[in-house]
Amino acid sequence: MPREKKKRGRRAEKSQSKRKWEDDEVPTSPKRQRTADEDNEAQAGDDYIPLDTRDTEKEQEQGQEDDTPFYGLLDAEEQEYFSKASQTLELNSFEDDDDKRLFIESVYAEARGKELKIACRQVKTLFEKFTGHFLHLVQHRFASHCCECLFIRAAPIVTSEMEKPKDRKKERKQTIENNGEEGGQDEPLNQRSAMELFLGVISELEGNWGYLLTESFASHTIRVLLLILAGEPLAGQSNARVLASRKKENVDSITPTSQSELTIQGSRQVPVEFNNTLRRMISDLSAGLNSTYLQALATHPIGSPVLQVILSIELGCMGTEKLKDKNSVFRRLIPDDTLETKEEGVNFLNSLFYDPVGSRLLETIVRVAPGKFFKTFYKNIIRERIGSLARNEIASYVVIKVLERVSREDLESAIESILPEIPSLVQRSRLNVIKTIIDRSIIRSADTASLAKALESAYGEDGLARLKAILGVETKDKDAEDLAKVKPKAGTSPQHIHGSLLAQSMLQASGTLAAMIQSSFLTAPTETLIQIANNPTASRALQEALKPSKLNTQFRRQFLPRFYGQMCDLSLDSSGSHVADALWDATSDLIFIKQRLAQELADNEPALRDSFLGRAVWRNWSMDLYKRKRGEWMSKAKGLDNTKVSPSTADSSAGPAKSKLDLARARYAARAEQQEKPDGKDQGSRGKKQALSAPSGLLKAQ
């Protein structure tokens, strides 16, 4: 193939340098430059569409007018360093605590002077650096996450400073001694407390609540601030949904390793200044919002979560005084006489049942509303139509919250109303309402016989088909199994998760509901049981069925022999290994079955030791003890401790374990005391003293 002719040597270099010099001289040429419009006109043709630059010019003008500060960017080396540091901290692969401390100190030293570019500074120092910039940071896509994390980390510091004030001068002196003058120069003596820093953030954001309430990123930060000021848990199940958008940045993938995140699971003590600031903040957030605007905000995808937090704080933290206050957010959203007159307010509440966003607000109201309001709400709006609401995909979640609050009589009445809808719910795999009914029936001691009959008629009388329908397990051929091993595993469907949870709830309920699942397990062949055990979702129901209790002893006696010859395969599977561990507790009162299963593990020792999962099962079954000290393993298998020789020494927390000589002395003393009981009290005490001294005399004689 012919090649392109190219010049080589000094002539080519000379021509390239000349061309480069000419290119550099172009911008300084006095010749008038052709504008973009002229260029477009010159190139215009029949099929030419001119480029509209008006939008670009407007964006540039808006960008020039925007006063959002630019804090700079990290260079490539700094980005690579902090990215690797973040990965190292997430993996937490340090040899010891000193190694981790030295690594963190080196990261702090590298981050000095770059606090507004990254968020890896000590909490209060970083708080000081961010002060004055929070209004812009909370509206930034990534900086808003930094602010939320900073506030969550600083919340426990407020409580700790209230409990025990710290001597900041002494603290700074210790820092200088540990890290030198360079380590203590960034911590001034007049460093503000965490409470003052939070109050400074609120004062900095004041006057801007109106548009921050519905701002896509700042609204998340407002929710965090509200919960911190109220002292509410920041990691609870009820507040986790409204804190932040977890799907946006995949926040759940980061595993929390700090102890400060573990201290915010429950309610915290907050200073009085926080209560006053919280009332003022809620008042400013809702200032100028009438009932019409609040009802529109209830279905707003960004503003509704903030409204949920405000209502939960008003109804849960501020007492009953807010219910009587006509200016409160709750009373402006739902007036006092709304539920009685059945006017526009009732229509508004009915519309929330079927709205994806408004139903979440209704769940919050049902969860935190006072008992008087809830009874009226249930009587006038929900009770007569709870069956149709349970059938709806969105309204069913509100029904679940309602079922968690009703009394035993109302629960039984609700069950009778929902029973006609059971076949439809089973057919469409909407099992969360049924699971909630079973859970609440266990707590309220309600009758579930009618529910069991409805479920049996919906799933059929065939036990194996019923088990497969509930757990979502299908029989696979060998070719299909080989194909599944090659293909990547897909995520578990919600229908299978709900089915597994329903089976677990049925097993926890005594009577007919548990018998339905147990009989289904007994009718299933061994291949199906192994398939269920190796399924990460369905195996949970199998583990629940294996939990020992007095009511399922007969079931376990019939069911456990089905695992003979399967222990090795179960131990080498990621889900089946959990079932193998559950078999240890399941055979606590069936020692002959436990010995048979343990012998299977011992026969397959090489395969188990070559696998990480197999080694875990080997350790949990104490197989080393089984091979070397069979008697001690038998005591452990029966649930007995070696130190528990007699009832008098059963309490191991009373003192250290007694030696054989001490135990012999105790038995000798007890025997002597029984022999001296027919005599008088004085003789009994004298005989006891002689008995206690007898073993020591015998020891000296030896």
From Swiss-Prot:
Question: Which positions does the entry assign to Pumilio repeats?
Answer: 288-325, 344-379, 380-416, 520-561, 562-599
Which keywords label this protein? Nucleus, Repeat, Ribosome biogenesis, rRNA processing
Q: What is this protein called?
A: Nucleolar protein 9
Q: From start to end residue, where is composition biased (Polar residues)?
A: 643-652
Q: Source gene?
A: NOP9
Q: Name one GO molecular function term.
A: RNA binding
Instruction: Report biased composition (Basic residues) as residue ranges.
Output: 1-11
Q: Which GO terms describe its biological process?
A: endonucleolytic cleavage in 5'-ETS of tricistronic rRNA transcript (SSU-rRNA, 5.8S rRNA, LSU-rRNA); endonucleolytic cleavage in ITS1 to separate SSU-rRNA from 5.8S rRNA and LSU-rRNA from tricistronic rRNA transcript (SSU-rRNA, 5.8S rRNA, LSU-rRNA); endonucleolytic cleavage to generate mature 5'-end of SSU-rRNA from (SSU-rRNA, 5.8S rRNA, LSU-rRNA); ribosomal small subunit export from nucleus
**GO cellular component annotations of the record:** 90S preribosome; nucleolus; preribosome, small subunit precursor
What PANTHER family does the entry give? NUCLEOLAR PROTEIN 9
**What InterPro entries does the annotation carry?**
ARM-like, ARM-type_fold, NOP9, Pumilio_RNA-bd_rpt
Question: Where does this protein reside within or beyond the cell?
Answer: Nucleus, Nucleolus
- What domain of life does the native source organism fall in? Eukaryota
Chain spans, region Disordered: 1-68, 162-189, 639-702
Originating species: Arthroderma gypseum (strain ATCC MYA-4604 / CBS 118893)
